[in-house]
Amino acid sequence: MSSINLSSSSPSTISLSRSRLSQSSTTLLHGLHRVTLPSNHPLSTFSIKTNTGKVKAAVISREDDLLSFTNGNTPLSNGSLIDDRTEEPLEADSVSLGTLAADSAPAPANGFVAEDDDFELDLPTPGFSSIPEAIEDIRQGKLVVVVDDEDRENEGDLVMAAQLATPEAMAFIVRHGTGIVCVSMKEDDLERLHLPLMVNQKENEEKLSTAFTVTVDAKHGTTTGVSARDRATTILSLASRDSKPEDFNRPGHIFPLKYREGGVLKRAGHTEASVDLTVLAGLDPVGVLCEIVDDDGSMARLPKLREFAAENNLKVVSIADLIRYRRKRDKLVERASAARIPTMWGPFTAYCYRSILDGIEHIAMVKGEIGDGQDILVRVHSECLTGDIFGSARCDCGNQLALSMQQIEATGRGVLVYLRGHEGRGIGLGHKLRAYNLQDAGRDTVEANEELGLPVDSREYGIGAQIIRDLGVRTMKLMTNNPAKYVGLKGYGLAIVGRVPLLSLITKENKRYLETKRTKMGHMYGLKFKGDVVEKIESESES
């Protein structure tokens, strides 16, 4: 995760000339200025006349607040605020929900400071080996320890490629595992070998709905089927493309499992991880897996798994890292259709993208020609039915959506990607409403999710990144306040050359929500440096 680090600027006093009315402004940080504009005005943007022409700018909120100006920390000397509609000097405050694309600065200068390595999805979670290292060991016929999420089974499995199984490997697995040796296989291979599920999925009462088939032993080359050599023989037979249904006795001592198509991207289980690793290693899609037990026979947890792996020179990888690895490389969406759509902000071209994994349809609103794909203004917006459609005042989602479209229209070129399935930061509409009830009872948005046993933010941006790339974007100015989104998109190889903040108006209804996002989730709703505090979040709008 990237760190939040705001560099400091020395304040300087400058003057805004506005039709015989001079107002003072303090230069703050990278195009943000504290400014006093005494009255109200319906505009959300205005222009500043300079010696070199006219540039767009915006005032955030109301009196004594923030003005955003494209020239970074350059003082606005001899500039005039111009009403864009009348070309006349502006005599009133200009209220905006954010800044224009021209107001962006290089991303590190805007507070999202992270080492380049922080964006590399191939880097393992601290304390784990990398996925490429595990893939190489699988390719060589070695065992790997695969660990799932602590909120799932929180267990580790010994995993290897089935086609490389040996009696020695089986003896090691049986000695350190539960003794229940499983072989994960794709549906086509199970059907070819006539291996039906033990119970249909509707009747499956196993905690994680693991899809067990009938058990088997190889008919040829085995005795009782239980020895390490017999089990290796059975596993090699299951992995063989030449095997036939009549080559197996039923029941037996090996437990075939049905792999979920899509692998760990559809189900974050050891069954799927074992096949995914063998496929990534260039081997046949059949994996061996067995749960590791502690010395007392209980399931081994992560500290013991690390100790065990170190003693036996085994790599330990997490399914979460495997998911990230695959999302970076697999094709996740396909373009379905496109049409021109006139909007309240102006004409856009809408592109529908369909998820290959789950069929969810997403939309990209494109303004102008992407051309060489350089320096494109981009907003990746997560679906929020209550805010975007019904205008809920609990959040600032609808305001950010409208502001993003407005800014893209004003810029004349840009992309807004609307990701569905992100409702409530990924928890879904029903859970979001339950969380609202807890918030009404005193919890904040983070505490409410945690009390419901749900992740604070489970959104993933691989689909958005692939849509952006498919549209031809190569470098972008990202409209966001969220460092997780910045890192999430950067991790998919997209070059982010600037960040454009989206600073929403504060209301009584959303103040606590925005404050929580700022203090607990790192959102950039306030700027603090060298004793001079600019905290929009602390000045509650009375409107």
From Swiss-Prot:
Designated name of the protein: Bifunctional riboflavin biosynthesis protein RIBA 1, chloroplastic
Positions that bind D-ribulose 5-phosphate: 152-153, 157, 267-271, 291
Annotated positions binding Mg(2+) 1: 153
Family: In the N-terminal section; belongs to the DHBP synthase family.
Essential for DHBP synthase activity (site feature) positions: 253, 291
Active site: 457 (proton acceptor), 459 (nucleophile)
Record region (GTP cyclohydrolase II): 329-543
Gene: RIBA1
